[in-house]
Amino acid sequence: MAEAYIIDAVRTPIGRRKGALSQEHPADMGAHVIKGLLERTGVDPEAIDDVVFGCLDNVGHQSGCVARTCWLAAGLPESVPGVTIDRQCGSSQQAVHFAAQGVMSGTQDLVVAGGTQQMSQIPIAFAMIAAKELGISDPFTGSKGWVE
């Protein structure tokens, strides 16, 4: 089995709720980190097999596949796919694990892993109530298998 290595790590500054970073788009924050990573390592963006990002509550500016949105916001090749993981507080850590598994399985060689989240714009657990206007009070109501 192939081994997986972390070749570098970059992060944004730690923000505060309603602080200096509160108006930054989560994709722009992720793009900033990805660009910094590629500049520091000299890795050719075309050599990247996948972008795996964690993000809690994929709604608003964080909706869709924010991993790919970050990549594209960085001005990088459209040929590189992305996937976003929501494992609550462990989302970015899970992204790193999935990236390592892709390399260890031999299906990928280079994967960018990380995460982005804008809690000043999207309050924690907002995704749980985001569909109220559609008549969906929470993700559980109406499920025959959900036990209260």
Name each model-derived stretch:
Residues 1-2, 16-47, 60-66, 71-148:
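Acyl-thioester C-C bond-transforming condensing/cleaving domain
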